[in-house]
Amino acid sequence: MSLPAHTGRRKYLIIARVGDNSLHASWLEPKEFRNFDLCLCYYGDHPGRYGGGCDYDLKDEGSKWSAIKQIVKRLGDDLFQYEAIWCPDESLQTDAFNINRMFHIFTDQALWLAQPALSADSDCSRRETVQHPEYILRYT
């Protein structure tokens, strides 16, 4: 698995392990709000399936976190050119506007670690991970 050099086009990076039912295509719209590079590590049966919509198109075996570990190792110092990195699950339904907003809050608040809240209709086991309409940001 090799990665091309960082293009410097965008401030943020999303690294996602994706299969044939990934929802990541919604992350790229509307295009005018896309402020991130997208690195997809595909584990399905159709190599190159998502190559057109991402900046880094990889195929690798193994679990989500072992694949992300390999990507991080290969990107090396190029990771430091990004202001923030997000490693979402492929099953998250969102769009470029909300991702842009998430990254803006992250950098505006100088956070070192963060995650977006889930919508009220999400399948989750922890109540504190669900959106609360009165908050922009919560510390836990």
Locations of regions flagged by a protein language model:
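N-terminal anchoring/stem segment of glycosyltransferases
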Residues: 1-84, 98
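Short, solvent-exposed loop/turn segments at secondary-structure junctions
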Residues: 21, 45-46, 92-93, 119-121
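Conserved catalytic core of nucleotide-sugar-dependent glycosyltransferases
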Residues: 84, 94-140
